Amino acid sequence: MKKNLTAAVFGMIALSIGAVSLARPVSAAWKDIKGLPDVRSWESGNAVIEDAVSAVCIDWSAGDIDVICGEGSSLLIEESSEKEIPEEERLCWYLSGSTLYIKYSSVKSFFHFGKSLNKHLTVTLPEDSRLEKLEIDSSAGDVNTAVSAEYLEMDCSAGDAVIRTEDPVKTMDLDFSAGDISLEAGEIEKLEIDSSAGAVEFSAAGIGSMDIDVSAGSVKGELTSFDSGEIDISAGSLELKLPSDANFTMKADISAGSLNSDIPFQKQGKTYIFGEGKAKLDIDISAGNVNILEKQSIGQ
């Protein structure tokens, strides 16, 4: 009996030690990247990076994230917390070519499972920077970005997001489990938004194609133009602000709710034709109203 008890104790100790040694695994999304070393060999702590950076990839477990542009010529990585950050829990970062990887670090043991320190990450890019890619994976915390990137990907489990960008974006892919999304952009070639619970509000000068899927929450959009789009809402309303000369064909399937429009249209069954009907928009609303509003011109 004593031998079994001793073995169990040593087993628990080994488990806790193992948990510590595995507390900093490389993100699953990064494991297949050639040449990316084990995170234990990365640099740690706040940093000033003088080298050119074309892509930023962030994996953050607990705390808010800000990605902004500054006035200097260097890239700054800073984390802060209401509590003192132990040396072994400082963020990890690695520069592979011109791609910067930043990872939340938390040394956990069996006896401290689930206790992650809430840390605020701020990444400040050089003035007038334009990234090829910005990728953010956040488990819990709000995200704020005000930078230029050709490709923007966000995967957030719990937290709101505010996204501001004026320069053209090729692809923007936002996947949120719980949290509101606020987006202001210029031209976007391809926009994909998947939200399980939360409100979505976006405005853009123009969108090539858009695919918006919201399980529970309202969607508000303001557009100058678009080529094609699909909007699927299980429970929530849809409001679109469009120019008075909007030119699109909309197929609407609304199970429980009504459709109202300030812009004239021709109706053919479940199809609504605005102008000559050039662009295509399919909407599917299970429970909620659809409102098409006229976008006010500047000066009105």
Region annotations inferred by a language model:
Residues 2-88, 107-131, 143-145, 262-278, ...:
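Short acidic/polar N-terminal linker immediately downstream of export determinants
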Residues 61, 94-96, 139, 148, ...:
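Structural motif
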Residues 62, 71, 81, 104-106, ...:
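A mature extracytoplasmic/lumenal domain signature
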Residues 90, 132, 136, 247, ...:
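Solvent-exposed beta-hairpin/edge-strand motifs
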Residues 164-166, 170-173, 180-300:
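Short, surface-exposed interaction patches in beta-rich subdomains
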Residues 71, 92-101, 275-276:
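Short, ordered beta-strand-loop transition motifs
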